[in-house]
C-alpha cells in the first residue's frame, strides 16, 4: 500500500533525528537535499538509490528514478526519505508538479512509502493548501514543535524546579539546545559554557541560523532586537528597528513567524482578523541572545566570561524569566485541562477610568467557565495585595473565577493557587 508522509517543523527541532531512526530501523533510502538545484539533487538521489540497490546507474529524471523504485517495490518494501525537500522547492518552481504527477501516475498503486521533510514551515503549509499540486496527496503529515516546559525538563531532571523554569526560559524546547544542557551544573554555569565563552557551541547560533534562512541578516536582526527589548506593536517595531515602513516590517515579521522565531499574539477573545495584536520573540534562545548578548557585544569582547555574566546578566535574569514564566503557566493549564479547555491567552484592555492599559496574565475558558490568573515570579509569596489587584482588574467581568501562580508560594493557598512544584507534578 502506498503512503506519502510529510514531516515539517523549524530547524533544530529533531526532524532529521526522527527520520534517521526510521532509516536505521527499516529498509529505507535516505537523501538530504541541498540548494544546488534539481539536476544536482537528482544525481545525488540516484547515487543513493544505486548504492541501496547495489547497482551502478544514474537516472535522467525523477520520473525514471521512481519508475525503477516502483518496480523494485513489487518484490520488497521500500521507504524513500527525502529530507529538507524545501531546499528543492526553493530552487525549482516545478518540483511540486513533478512530484504530484509521480504520485498520481506511478505511486498510487505501488507499495512504495515516500516521506518528505522541510524546515521552511510556511512553504510546506502553502504546498499543502487548496489548489496547490500536493493538496490532498499526503496520507499522513506531522508538524514537529519544540517541547513545552514539561517535556523539555526531562533533559535536566536533576535541576531544582525553579531552575527548570530558568533553563526553559533561556534554552526553550528545541531538542538540539536542551540536549546540550548539563544538569550537574547551575543555570549560570550552563549559560557561560554554552553561550558566553569564546567558542561556546551557541555563541554564533543565532546569526548562523539567520544566515541560513534570510538574505538580510542585519535587518532581521534589528527587528528581533527591537521586539526582544520591549517593542511589541508594529509601529514601534518598525521605528525602533530602523525599517521605518510598517508594510515592509510586516513582511519581515511574517517570515520570522514562519521560521518559529517570532509569534503574533492576539488578546484573549479576539478573532484572527483583530488589530488588537502584539509581536513577541517566541524562540527563547533568540530572545536571550538579543536581550543580553547582541547589544553588549563590545563588553563581551572586553570582559572575561565571569565578569560579563555578573555585570550584564545576573541581576536581570529573573526579570527575563518572569516573562517566560507566564508561558509556562499557560502550558501547565493546557496540560491540566487538556480535555475541557476551550480558549486560553493573555488579555489586555484600556481602562478608560484609569486612562491606562491593563493586562491580565492568563484568561481561560474551561468547561464553559471563565478564569483569570496572575503569575508572579518573585521571591515573595503571593498575599492579599496581589490577590486584591487581580480582583480590581476583573471587577467589570461577571462570573469569573480567579487563580494564581507563584514562584515562592502563598500566604494562604487556595484551590487555584499553584507553585513551581505543582508545575512539574502532573
Q: Whereabouts are the PLM-identified features?
A:
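Phosphate-binding site recognition
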Residues: 1-306, 310-311
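A cross-kingdom feature that marks ATP-driven nucleic-acid transaction machinery
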Residues: 268, 276-426
Amino acid at each position: 500500500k502506498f503512503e506519502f508522509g510529510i514531516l515539517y517543523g523549524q530547524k533544530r527541532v529533531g526532524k532529521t533525528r526522527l527520520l534517521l531512526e526510521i532509516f536505521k530501523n527499516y529498509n529505507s533510502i535516505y537523501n538530504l537535499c541541498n540548494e544546488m538545484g534539481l539536476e544536482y539533487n537528482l544525481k545525488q538521489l540516484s547515487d543513493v538509490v544505486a548504492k541501496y540497490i547495489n547497482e551502478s546507474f544514474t537516472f535522467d529524471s525523477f520520473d525514471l528514478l521512481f519508475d525503477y523504485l516502483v518496480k523494485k517495490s513489487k518484490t520488497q518494501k521500500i521507504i524513500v526519505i527525502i529530507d529538507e525537500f524545501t531546499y528543492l522547492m526553493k530552487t525549482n518552481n516545478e518540483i511540486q508538479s513533478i512530484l504530484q504527477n509521480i504520485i498520481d501516475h506511478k505511486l498510487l498503486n505501488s507499495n512504495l512509502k515516500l516521506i518528505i521533510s522541510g524546515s521552511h514551515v510556511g512553504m510546506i503549509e502553502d504546498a499543502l493548501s487548496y489548489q496547490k499540486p500536493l493538496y490532498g496527496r499526503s496520507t499522513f503529515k506531522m508538524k514537529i514543535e519544540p517541547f513545552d516546559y514539561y517535556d523539555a525538563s526531562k533533559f535536566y531532571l536533576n535541576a531544582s524546579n525553579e531552575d527548570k523554569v530558568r533553563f526553559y526560559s533561556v534554552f526553550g524546547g528545541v531538542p538540539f539546545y536542551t540536549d546540550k544542557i548539563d544538569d550537574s551544573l547551575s543555570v549560570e554555569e550552563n549559560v557561560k559554557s554554552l553561550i558566553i565563552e569564546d567558542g561556546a557551541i551557541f555563541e554564533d547560533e543565532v546569526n548562523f541560523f539567520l544566515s541560513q534562512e534570510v538574505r538580510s541578516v542585519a535587518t532581521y536582526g534589528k527587528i528581533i532586537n527591537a521586539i526582544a527589548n520591549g517593542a511589541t506593536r508594529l509601529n514601534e517595531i518598525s521605528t525602533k528597528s530602523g525599517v521605518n515602513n510598517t508594510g515592509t516590517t510586516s513582511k519581515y515579521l511574517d517570515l520570522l513567524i514562519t521560521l518559529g522565531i517570532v509569534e503574533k499574539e492576539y488578546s484573549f477573545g479576539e478573532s484572527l482578523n483583530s488589530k488588537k495584536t502584539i509581536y513577541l520573540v517566541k524562540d527563547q534562545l533568540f530572545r536571550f541572545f538579543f536581550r543580553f548578548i547582541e547589544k553588549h557585544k563590545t563588553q563581551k569582547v572586553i570582559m572575561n566570561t565571569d565578569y560579563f555574566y555578573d555585570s550584564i546578566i545576573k541581576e536581570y535574569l529573573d526579570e527575563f524569566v518572569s516573562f517566560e514564566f507566564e508561558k509556562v503557566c499557560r502550558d501547565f493549564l493546557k496540560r491540566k485541562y487538556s480535555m475541557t479547555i476551550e480558549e486560553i491567552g493573555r488579555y489586555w484592555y484600556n481602562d478608560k477610568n484609569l486612562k491606562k492599559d491593563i493586562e491580565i496574565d492568563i484568561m481561560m475558558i474551561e468547561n464553559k467557565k471563565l478564569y483569570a490568573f496572575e503569575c508572579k515570579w518573585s521571591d515573595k509569596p503571593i498575599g492579599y495585595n496581589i490577590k486584591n489587584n487581580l480582583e480590581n482588574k476583573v471587577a467589570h467581568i461577571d462570573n469569573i473565577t480567579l487563580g494564581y501562580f507563584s514562584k515562592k508560594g502563598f500566604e494562604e493557598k487556595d484551590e487555584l493557587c499553584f507553585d513551581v512544584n505543582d508545575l512539574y507534578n502532573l
